[in-house]
Amino acid sequence: MASPDWGYDDKNGPEQWSKLYPIANGNNQSPVDIKTSETKHDTSLKPISVSYNPATAKEIINVGHSFHVNFEDNDNRSVLKGGPFSDSYRLFQFHFHWGSTNEHGSEHTVDGVKYSAELHIAHWNSAKYSNLAEAASKADGLAVIGVLMKVGEANPKLQKVLDALQAIKTKGKRAPFTNFDPSTLLPSSLDFWTYPGSLTHPPLYESVTWIICKESISVSSEQLAQFRSLLSNVEGDNAVPMQHNNRPTQPLKGRTVRASF
């Protein structure tokens, strides 16, 4: 399998992405630092509503720079509504970002504070587009819920995901991952910040409406170590653990971050 043209090392990492993906220097890039004193409370924001059918969970895949849990997205059994959205957005995936130590790893930060990891639950606009490929590059095409993860107590709700990692140790491996509702990973409060942004790795499309939960969830040091023990190499090659896969924060460039609270 050819190595991708981007990654998280010095030679192909975030500082280099703009050479192949000029949008990396665009005006709506993610992640960002959320400066709470500069956010705007918006009374028009509705509560976030998620309805995920566990039967849509499909498989878990080691993609070399991370792992993805993918969902069947051929109908509206699993959707996100409310918040800033007038359309319904269909669940297709969740994944995580983490760092080489517990001191950093999240992509978004709050008042400069870095968290240990970040969960992304990704959806596409099924009201306007016919599939993910069509929606992925459109300004209103994607909606991603970001949940900051704070090191502390072990999070039992992560256990099914962590147990599945054994089967996908190396790049390209995939395994069935069924009967799972990712809303179980959300914090108890769904207060959120929202802003227009981008995918946080290539192709970096500026097509994401971000929903960042105000409340974090817990993850233990041991659980984070399990993320880092995944390998970015194909089976049989020298072991290269996935130490980190988080992009640094990008300038807001005049964007407003709205708060639901």
Curated annotation (Swiss-Prot):
Documented EC number(s): 4.2.1.1, 4.2.1.69
Cited Pfam families: Carb_anhydrase
Upper classification of the organism: Eukaryota, Metazoa, Chordata, Craniata, Vertebrata
Residues binding substrate: 200-201
Entry superkingdom: Eukaryota
Cofactor(s) named in the record: Zn(2+)
Notes on activation and inhibition: Inhibited by acetazolamide.
Matches recorded under InterPro entries: CA_dom, CA_dom_sf, Carbonic_anhydrase_a-class, Carbonic_anhydrase_a-class_CS
Record PTM N-acetylalanine, positions in chain: 2
Key words, A-Z: Acetylation, Cytoplasm, Lyase, Metal-binding, Zinc
UniProt-annotated location(s): Cytoplasm
Gene field: CA1
Principal place of residence: cytoplasm
Chain residue ranges for the region called Disordered: 1-40, 241-261
Protein name (database record): Carbonic anhydrase 1
Acetylation among keywords: yes
Similarity comment: family membership: Belongs to the alpha-carbonic anhydrase family.
Summary of the function given for this chain in its UniProt record: Catalyzes the reversible hydration of carbon dioxide. Can hydrate cyanamide to urea.
Catalytic activity: hydrogencarbonate + H(+) = CO2 + H2O; urea = cyanamide + H2O
Amino-acid positions noted as binding Zn(2+) in the UniProt annotation, renumbered to this chain: 95, 97, 120
Residue stretches making up the Alpha-carbonic anhydrase domain: 4-261
